[in-house]
Amino acid sequence: MGPVGIILIVVAAVLVAGGFVAMLIFTTPIAKKVYRDQLVRTSPDKWGRVCSCPENEEQQAMWDAGIAWAKPRAGRKTNVEIENDGFRLVGEYYDFGHDRCAIILPGRCECLIYSYYFAAPYEDADFNVLVVDTRCHGESDGIYNTIGVKESGDVLTWAKLMHERFGNKEVWIHGICIGTSSGIFALTSPDRPDYLKGLVTEGCYVSLRETFKRHMMADKRPLFPVLDQVMWQINKHTGTNVYRQKPIRQIKKMPADCRVLFLYGKQDIFSIPKKSQKLFDACSAKDKKLMWFAKGGHSHLRINNIESYDRAIFEFFN
């Protein structure tokens, strides 16, 4: 190749590199905004104790039904709080006179009032119930969502409170979407106590990047390079590496003595069936069960299948 050819290649490389840099200059502010909108509590009112999506009829119905469940049980409620990682975290404990407790971990944007809706099947299955404002939600402290990684320490601290203060011999986790990620990291932690027994998961994703991609696709947003720029923002602000710290990888470390019930919907467009099956297959717990529901979108399985959803939980434990 002659000098002219070499010069042309160099010029082309410079133009391509320059174009890529120009693109990043344009897309970086977009990625920062997406990150702040979706995963950062930018004001005290954000992710407060309100219905996160009142325009969605099913979401509002779940909210109303949860409040209807909690109201007549107010006499069984104890307001509780813990401190972990320097954050004050709050919850409500409902004592039904049993020796085991279910901690309900809601998805992103949701507070403990949302979790009331999932408490009913546990009351019926002879559990006490703890609902919590996860960090940076409701009345709990915090700004950044760490995708379940540091929240897992919060879960372990809640479990310790349930065991030591309230005498629960067993503590179980019910996780919805990202709440399951916190549960998986807690159960696979070297600090997991013997009384933390297992998990019921609804709609858990294989990785945050995978489900975030599907949310962006549903919103008809361009993926490249914004998707991975958002993942970089997560790492920059929280230290979480979503490429390595993800449920599909962590669940392979699930202790053999844990029990896990997977609840998934065939209509879920964010935790799609093919990926959900992979998560179940990867789980190293000896006692695991997978149940599919034909109807119901992401995090909306119970409202579309109340009888069979509640029965699945009851039969898993009884």
Question: What positions do the PLM features span?
Answer:
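Conserved alpha/beta-hydrolase
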Residues: 119-141
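Conserved alpha/beta-hydrolase "acid-adjacent" motif
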Residues: 243, 269-275
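Alpha/beta-hydrolase active-site loop
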Residues: 145-166
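Hydrolase active-site cap/lid region
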Residues: 185-242
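The serine-hydrolase catalytic nucleophile loop
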Residues: 108-121, 134, 274
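Short beta-strand/loop motif that positions the catalytic acidic residue
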Residues: 254-256, 262-264, 268
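Catalytic histidine-centered segment of alpha/beta-hydrolase-like enzymes
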Residues: 296-307
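An N-terminal hydrophobic leader/cap segment in hydrolases
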Residues: 12-82
